[in-house]
Amino acid sequence: MDRYCVFGNPIGHSKSPLIHRLFAEQTGEALVYDAQLAPLDDFPGFARRFFEQGKGANVTVPFKEEAYRLVDELSERATRAGAVNTLIRLADGRLRGDNTDGAGLLRDLTANAGVELRGKRVLLLGAGGAVRGVLEPFLGECPAELLIANRTARKAVDLAERFADLGAVHGCGFAEVEGPFDLIVNGTSASLAGDVPPLAQSVIEPGRTVCYDMMYAKEPTAFNRWAAERGAARTLDGLGMLVEQAAEAFFLWRGVRPASAPVLETLRRQLATV
């Protein structure tokens, strides 16, 4: 039976095995998928050994940049992102790297939540790998403006310059952000520590601005609580992004696109009972 996995460290918390088991049951695809705790000091060797038999893998923290350097060929979106979250073993044994994070977030926003980006003013918080992965698909939706804000302004400016050929994208520090915005996406890990990036209240227009945190938890994240208190029209978390990026990876491996809605519903129910 074809074998797949997710590489990470730590990895015990991963929902990917459940997601892909549900996808396989739904589509009738015969495969096994498990979580692999990869060593911090030898990810390349560990991954190569898996791919002596394995057909594909997802990659989570902290190995996305190492996976980018490991592969024999890259998709255009992975090249742009500078990170790989999906590995595919080709027929000749070479490894191809792709990045489905941006496609997953975009599909969660547009298909699941009905959020339009075209002609809108969009603020992305953070300039790390999570944000790098979504810039290309976001700019493909032709927003009026896409602003990247980061604690270190230079990093945001440099990142914006890398993607300037794709649309109206700029970078700045948190203190320089002037609102309001139609959509704000938190790509920082601040919510994990219960923090929120230091933003002016003007970034949110009550009743209009949609706020999305790439993090998720049983209770609303710190960022989404902050947004709701300031009148955001809607607050969304990253659980849908997790499911949608997995669906995109499943499609790359198997050529079958699973229905994500029932899987997302299952995960929501499970999260509520934790």
From Swiss-Prot:
Catalytic activity entry: shikimate + NADP(+) = 3-dehydroshikimate + NADPH + H(+)
NCBIfam families named in the record: aroE (TIGR00507), PRK00258.1-2 (NF001310)
Complex formation: Homodimer.
Stored Pfam families: SDH_C, Shikimate_DH, Shikimate_dh_N
The EC number(s) this enzyme carries: 1.1.1.25
Function of the protein: Involved in the biosynthesis of the chorismate, which leads to the biosynthesis of aromatic amino acids. Catalyzes the reversible NADPH linked reduction of 3-dehydroshikimate (DHSA) to yield shikimate (SA).
Active-site residues per Swiss-Prot or TrEMBL entry: K64
Residues reported in the UniProt entry to bind NADP(+): E76, G126, A127, G128, G129, A130, N150, R151, T152, A153, R154, K155, M214, G238
Entry keyword set: Amino-acid biosynthesis, Aromatic amino acid biosynthesis, NADP, Oxidoreductase
Protein name, per record: Shikimate dehydrogenase (NADP(+))
This protein's GO CC annotations: cytosol
Pathway: Metabolic intermediate biosynthesis; chorismate biosynthesis; chorismate from D-erythrose 4-phosphate and phosphoenolpyruvate: step 4/7
Recorded superkingdom: Bacteria
Lineage: Bacteria, Pseudomonadati, Pseudomonadota, Gammaproteobacteria, Pseudomonadales
Similarity annotation: Belongs to the shikimate dehydrogenase family.
Residues noted as binding shikimate in the record, renumbered to the chain: S14, K15, S16, T60, N85, D101, Y216
